[in-house]
Amino acid sequence: MTTLEAIKFDRTNVTLQILDQLLIPYSTEYLNIEGVDDAYDAIKSMQVRGAPAIAIVGSFAIVVEIKNRHISSIDELAAKIDYLESSRPTAVNLSNACNEIRALLGNSESLDEVYKRVFDFAVALYDDDLSNNHKIGSNGVDYLVESLRSQNFEGPFSIITYCNTGSLATSGHGTALGIVRSAYKALSKENSKEKFWLEQIYPCETRPYNQGAKLTTFELKYEKIPFTLICDNMVTSLISRTHNKKQVKDIVAPVKFAIVGADRIVQNGDTANKIGTFQLAAIFDSFNRRNTGPRDSLKMIVAAPRTTIDLKTTTGDDIIIEERPANELTTLKGPILRKDVAGEKQIVGVATPGIQVWNPAFDVTPHELIDSIVTEEKVYAKDKEGNYHL
């Protein structure tokens, strides 16, 4: 499969482009990132998003900043790094990358001295992320197979996804969606060597920014992985119908897993991710509490690289949650469609004007509601006391 390329960094000419994700799925256009200011704007406006991707873009932007000589001293560079880090505070990957670049500055007195160090760091960050995503995919598939075998499950099954965690959120392949990609390759009806097969993906729309509807469906369609889009508030009905062997759009494949990404995982396993993830986990927990046997059990899986794990923070109570502008909830922006042809972009209202709005970008799912955390190193499960050891 050929995956989408959200980040283009020319290592010879030292230029950076990103795919403008605000225009997807109706057009694919790349933006030039000339330095830190451009990267800050792109990250803040969510033209690029996803914890691994914003760390990579931020790091490459610092390289381009030095190369283009937008700054004249180490002190100016340090100030630019501080500014960049403030663009999205919840995602730990960007903060970690900025801290590592600060350490590379050391006692250097010239920009020429630090340029190669930062260049090498940014390139390694990109390459490692891509390699690690494939490992996450492989580890995730092993976990799916082990779980279904332990239940003596047979026949088709389906997976729920949330937000966007694929090539558009990383250097490529993806984290949670990377597991889906790897799973479909290994466990589609045509390829599966097991008594079960992956029949369908259900991406949640993911309000209010609709990354699931716009981005995840774009990736799944691009790679010809079968899917059916659902609204966030359809999850309970979907699980109930599929487990009662009722058709959903002519498909009978019980939901067995939700696979989500993470913007920050803290020491005890509490996980910050796109708003609504906690709700999804609570729904899974509710169904598991009332299921009639192990064959009916659902698994809530978090997929993320080790760089997303923040061992300095003890619990999710200490995670700073970014709040987004009210208009992202009260309006929608998109092109006017005429016979599926995209025309001029318009902003339309979907709520009463002048109202109070609360619009947090993330929530924190308690570790008690997470069945496993899949990384490039291993799959973490809780011990007998219900604790993670990350």
Curated annotation (Swiss-Prot):
Q: What is this protein called?
A: Methylthioribose-1-phosphate isomerase
Instruction: Please state what class of enzyme this protein is.
Output: isomerase
Q: Which reaction does it catalyse?
A: 5-(methylsulfanyl)-alpha-D-ribose 1-phosphate = 5-(methylsulfanyl)-D-ribulose 1-phosphate
Family (UniProt): Belongs to the eIF-2B alpha/beta/delta subunits family. MtnA subfamily.
InterPro entries found in the cross-reference section: IF-2B-related, IF-M1Pi, IF_2B-like_C, Initiation_fac_2B_a/b/d, M1Pi_N, NagB/RpiA_transferase-like
Active-site positions, per UniProt? D263
Subcellular location(s) per record: Cytoplasm; Nucleus
One of the GO BP terms on file: L-methionine salvage from methylthioadenosine
Residues annotated as transmembrane: none
Sites annotated Transition state stabilizer: C163
- Organism listed in the record: Meyerozyma guilliermondii (strain ATCC 6260 / CBS 566 / DSM 6381 / JCM 1539 / NBRC 10279 / NRRL Y-324)
Q: Name one GO molecular function term.
A: S-methyl-5-thioribose-1-phosphate isomerase activity
Q: Which UniProt keywords apply?
A: Amino-acid biosynthesis, Cytoplasm, Isomerase, Methionine biosynthesis, Nucleus
- Output a single Gene Ontology CC term carried by this record: cytoplasm
Q: Has the keyword DNA-binding been applied to this entry?
A: no
Q: Which NCBIfam families match?
A: eIF-2B_rel, PRK05720.1, salvage_mtnA
Q: What is its EC number?
A: 5.3.1.23
Alphabetical list of Gene3D superfamilies matching this protein:
translation initiation factor eif-2b, domain 1, Translation initiation factor eif-2b, domain 2
**What HAMAP family would the database entry show?**
Salvage_MtnA
